[in-house]
């Protein structure tokens, strides 16, 4: 672990001959003195119990496509391939694509953490575990993060070009042709309503869910059920 007081002066010294935007410099420094130290603090404060946190009782096995990249979801496929090639992925790919799917699908936190530890060259447990357990999976129930970072396909479409070349249609909310992130997002909120509906940062999402009629709720749950059946039967999803 490189301590902050050594890291930052060295970084600032390298900037003297480089033309780097101020917002990029600020963002990097804030990550070093803020988020990194916060993760380290959570780890030392909450271990070893933190390693077994599973607030949402997520129990779905880690899909094989996390290792093989054999999936029809282009965002997942691309991020896994990048990880295979480089032992690295951007933090948004980790959180809002791979972590987001793990959250929505209810993957077991221990298996997700094991995967992150194995595949990334920069994965040290003190920083990987809080980010995955607390930030990506909300498995600690809000110790680290104030809400689950759950998002539908529309978010991924806005933030990337993955959806343009995907097998699924991101504009379709249901059926086997629709993006799984769309119905899995609402199914996630339905499944975990008892634990999450009082979270103020999810109030708009739950108000939208309440406006949906029973038929819509049933369709969401049906699509999610079919998806999980195919996944658990070894079919390509």
Name each model feature, range by range:
Residues 3-237:
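C-terminal catalytic domain of photolyase/cryptochrome flavoproteins
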